Amino acid sequence: MKSTLRISLKSGEKIFINGAVLRVDRKVALEFLNDVTFLLENHVLQPDQATTPLRQLYFIAQMILINPEGREQSTNMFRKSVSMLLNCFQHDEILAELKRIDGLVASGKAFEALKAIRGLYTIEEKILSNQEMTPATIEQIRKEIAPWR
């Protein structure tokens, strides 16, 4: 880490740091002085919110950060899911970004991958509302990822 990172949390807010879940009892500022893997509570997707292919991919990617003990299993599932999505999506921007996201996770940058996946949600909504991806394909993706929910 080239510089310190400062994060402000509100009373009752949670943060996931290196696999541990912390809840603060009052407004607090945290300053990270070295490299740390963290995820803010408002960026954590709950299983019942993983309702689209990209949200399911996000859920798996967040498990890489939240559950260090299961990192290898989560990473393997992530790679399998990306491969499946590359075969299902036909939108050039999503395909290019999925390849970049895969590279981010492979290089240990899962946090950056989460931000990139969130950036694709709007495009995915348009694709799904225009039925550019068949319901059968969406259902196939859901079945593949179901064990994670």
From Swiss-Prot:
Q: Which GO terms describe its biological process?
A: bacterial-type flagellum organization; mRNA catabolic process; negative regulation of bacterial-type flagellum assembly
Give the stretches traversing the membrane.
Answer: none
InterPro entries reported for this sequence: Flagellum_FlbT
Q: In the record, what terms sit under GO molecular function?
A: mRNA 5'-UTR binding
Q: Which keywords appear in this protein's UniProt record, sorted alphabetically? A: Bacterial flagellum biogenesis, Repressor, RNA-binding
Superkingdom of origin: Bacteria
Q: Which family does it belong to?
A: Belongs to the FlbT family.
**Purpose:** Has a post-transcriptional repressor function in flagellum biogenesis. Associates with the 5'-UTR of fljK mRNA and promotes its degradation.
Q: What is this protein called?
A: Probable flagellum biosynthesis repressor protein FlbT
Q: Which organism is it from?
A: Agrobacterium fabrum (strain C58 / ATCC 33970)
